């Protein structure tokens, strides 16, 4: 289920009978609508939500209004109901704990935030590995470590999100994009190129064109360090990648012209930003040389 597609269908005038019937999927659609700014859809979706999910939506609205007190009240209520004997829901409980972690981090309660997010990661993994919320929890755990300067631990969290599944393609792509930024900061540029390549193609597969353009431009910008027909093609480099041992030299930062040509041709008609055009002009010159 792609919540973006469902939101698009609702905006086109289709009725709520199109809402998915799986566990918590209407909640996912409602949150997508809020995230896209289509709050006018929420009144129609609300009858499809259970009591716990309704309080999560109230939490979302409180965040939109920068009302931290109401946000905490809504989460507390949702968490209490999710733990009740009558309406126990382990997956929603874990999701709420993740949200508590995010909220606590924003309030400066960093240690407790980490406890909440870690609990959510472990719980959702046990309940439904690869679920959308499992991926979100891992991404938030990585961000928590990154904000503490724990780059290795952040990368370890991203490594938990395998490109071979079971996580959603958009989760994998977001993870690889974030991992690339960490690797760039560590000056591990060829590893960053591999991650940007995976992110770019995953974003394309997920119809996230803006993110695909950004990742692709960044890949070209780094890759123009050296363009050589002796360089491994990126898919080969990805499949043959192995962890480096301590003391091993960093891989050469270079790309194959076939990969550059593919990326250039895909991007050329999809951006008119001056900075992007400059990068593409450099790519064109490299391909002509």
Predicted feature residues:
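C-terminal non-catalytic interaction modules
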Residues: 1-25, 216, 223-289
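Residue signature of alpha-solenoid helical repeat architecture, marking inter-repeat boundaries
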Residues: 20, 49, 91, 132, ...
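Residue register of alpha-helical TPR repeats
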Residues: 24, 53-56, 93-95, 134-136, ...
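Structural register within alpha-helical repeat arrays
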Residues: 29, 58, 93, 100, ...
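Residue at a conserved register position within TPR or TPR-like alpha-solenoid repeats
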Residues: 33, 62, 97, 104, ...
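Structural motif corresponding to the intra-repeat A-B loop/turn of tetratricopeptide repeats
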Residues: 36, 65, 107, 148, ...
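Amphipathic alpha-helical segments of tetratricopeptide repeats
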Residues: 43, 47, 76-84, 118-126, ...
